[in-house]
Amino acid sequence: MPIIAVIDYDMGNLHSACKGLQEAGTQTIVSDRPEDLVSADAVVLPGVGAFDPAMQHLRSRQLIPVIQDILASGKPFLGICLGLQILFEGSEEGTEAGLGIIPGTVKRFQSEPGITIPHMGWNQLEYQQPDLPLWRHSPAQPWVYFVHSYYVDPVDPTVKAATVTHGTQTITAAIARDNLMAVQFHPEKSSTFGLQILANFVEQVQATLATPAV
């Protein structure tokens, strides 16, 4: 059974994500200790809240270089909500530098008639990487649950794995590149499809463990 480390940096309730991963057949460990993250088979970076405090909490725990090294190592990595946004270089929400893993910035939705900010509730995904393993056994345009006022804007459009449209604004809802996957929506709140995403991630971790190192 693979061990997945869920990074604890005081930015949200981690219980739901852990429960979903455990139901998918994995053991989870919630930790902010670098040695736990490095020794795990995969890492999940969840989070809700604001960009600057998130980066400050990671820095105070000396986790920024640890996360960067884990991503460079090829270990499966899943970011959720704020855990997607802080992978980028910075945010209009604050002044702190992000992790800088993905070139691009985090922007705020523009006000327009007929929409609410934050973007809150159920909305449909449009796949940009339809063959991504994270989407296995899933409908063509699944409904998922969002709660956010900011969205990621990657420089390289090929990292986009899915988009969503709020009013007239179509924004990035998920990214994927090599071992890194991250979603703006909350899988743990997205009913059957969300649990399937977590199960697919666990399946990828198991496949990685079964593949001999070159």
Swiss-Prot record:
The active site is at C81, H186, E188. Pfam families: GATase. Keywords: Amino-acid biosynthesis, Cytoplasm, Glutamine amidotransferase, Histidine biosynthesis, Hydrolase, Lyase. It catalyses: 5-[(5-phospho-1-deoxy-D-ribulos-1-ylimino)methylamino]-1-(5-phospho-beta-D-ribosyl)imidazole-4-carboxamide + L-glutamine = D-erythro-1-(imidazol-4-yl)glycerol 3-phosphate + 5-amino-1-(5-phospho-beta-D-ribosyl)imidazole-4-carboxamide + L-glutamate + H(+); L-glutamine + H2O = L-glutamate + NH4(+). Its main location: cytoplasm. Pathway: Amino-acid biosynthesis; L-histidine biosynthesis; L-histidine from 5-phospho-alpha-D-ribose 1-diphosphate: step 5/9. Residues 3-211 form the Glutamine amidotransferase type-1 domain. Its EC number is 4.3.2.10, 3.5.1.2. It comes from the Bacteria. It is found in: Cytoplasm. GO terms for molecular function: glutaminase activity; imidazoleglycerol-phosphate synthase activity; lyase activity. GO terms for cellular component: cytoplasm. GO terms for biological process: L-histidine biosynthetic process. Heterodimer of HisH and HisF. HAMAP family: HisH. NCBIfam families: IMP_synth_hisH. IGPS catalyzes the conversion of PRFAR and glutamine to IGP, AICAR and glutamate. The HisH subunit catalyzes the hydrolysis of glutamine to glutamate and ammonia as part of the synthesis of IGP and AICAR. The resulting ammonia molecule is channeled to the active site of HisF. This is Imidazole glycerol phosphate synthase subunit HisH. The gene is hisH.
